[in-house]
């Protein structure tokens, strides 16, 4: 994928860029793998905002992605199309299996239309093939990794990211995450070989606020420009700095959003570098 820059015909177009979609081979999704997607606007079942800055945006249809692939072991599949997916940063690949079934997977870098992919313990080590970590050599770059055997891919699914398999010891494999964190995962967990494609997506300059609204992202207003009734940093005569340590609109100190006693933390060998004191 390459980035195409717009000519500066308007202030919103100046500096803006877009993907050239050169890898995309079909513009309409497979009907049997599409489900309706209803926007919630960041609201919960009571109608209250639980996630701010969400709402609006272009209507989308959800593409059902196969994040497991274990039930297709030993069945070869041909890559019929590389398609755009509005619900994620990565592109997706439509597979036609020899038994007649069609499924979507996340498209890894280098996977082309017409390629043959497979899954299972005896699959070759090449992009798009899915197999257990115990059957993947150390040093291999992988993506779409399970956290628990049979639980479906949870790690490294965004455009351009990858995980490196550092080694295996006993029933665990050591993985270097995109953040730099080193984590142990059960060797029975499955992963797909290669890195996720569409890496240039990170270099897109959106150019104007309107394009973010098309994506369903609403403005983020700073607390210091609000009134005291709306935010702890609000109010004051003239321009102020907030006058206190940063807090949320509900008075909670900023940062430290991770659960401190998460059970899976015991499998972290080395934490990611955050730049914060712990």
UniProtKB/Swiss-Prot annotation:
BP term (GO), one: cytoplasmic translation
Basic residues compositional bias, start-end: 37-58, 269-278
Keyword RNA-binding on entry: yes
Keywords for the protein's UniProt record, in alphabetical order: Ribonucleoprotein, Ribosomal protein, RNA-binding, rRNA-binding
Region (Disordered): 27-58, 224-278
SMART domains, A to Z: Ribosomal_L2 (SM01383), Ribosomal_L2_C (SM01382)
NCBIfam families: rplB_bact
Designated name of the protein: Large ribosomal subunit protein uL2
Gene that this polypeptide is encoded by: rplB
């Amino acid at each position: 994928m390459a980035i195409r820059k717009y000519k500066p015909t308007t202030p919103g177009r100046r500096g803006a860029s877009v993907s050239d979609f050169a890898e995309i081979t079909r513009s309409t999704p497979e009907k049997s793998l599409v489900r309706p997607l209803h926007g919630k606007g960041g609201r919960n079942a009571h109608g209250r905002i639980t996630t701010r800055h969400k709402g609006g945006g272009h209507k989308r249809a959800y593409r059902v992605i196969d994040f497991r692939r274990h039930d297709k072991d030993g069945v070869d599949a041909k890559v019929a199309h590389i398609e755009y997916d509005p619900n994620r940063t990565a592109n997706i690949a439509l597979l036609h299996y020899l038994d007649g079934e069609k499924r979507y997977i996340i498209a890894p870098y280098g996977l082309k239309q017409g390629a043959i992919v497979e899954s299972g313990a005896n699959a070759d080590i090449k992009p798009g093939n899915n197999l257990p970590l115990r059957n993947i050599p150390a040093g291999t770059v992988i993506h779409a990794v399970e956290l628990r055997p049979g639980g479906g891919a949870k790690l490294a699914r965004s455009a351009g990211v990858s995980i490196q398999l550092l080694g295996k010891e006993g029933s665990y494999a050591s993985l270097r995450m995109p953040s730099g964190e080193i984590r142990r995962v059960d060797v029975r967990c499955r992963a797909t070989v290669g890195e996720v494609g569409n890496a240039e997506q990170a270099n897109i300059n959106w150019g104007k606020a309107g394009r973010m609204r098309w994506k369903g992202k609403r403005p983020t207003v700073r607390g210091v420009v609000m009134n005291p009734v709306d935010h702890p940093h609000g109010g004051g005569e003239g321009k102020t700095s907030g006058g206190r340590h940063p807090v949320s609109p509900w008075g909670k100190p900023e940062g430290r959003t991770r659960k401190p006693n998460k059970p899976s933390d015991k499998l972290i060998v080395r934490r990611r570098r955050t730049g914060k004191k712990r």
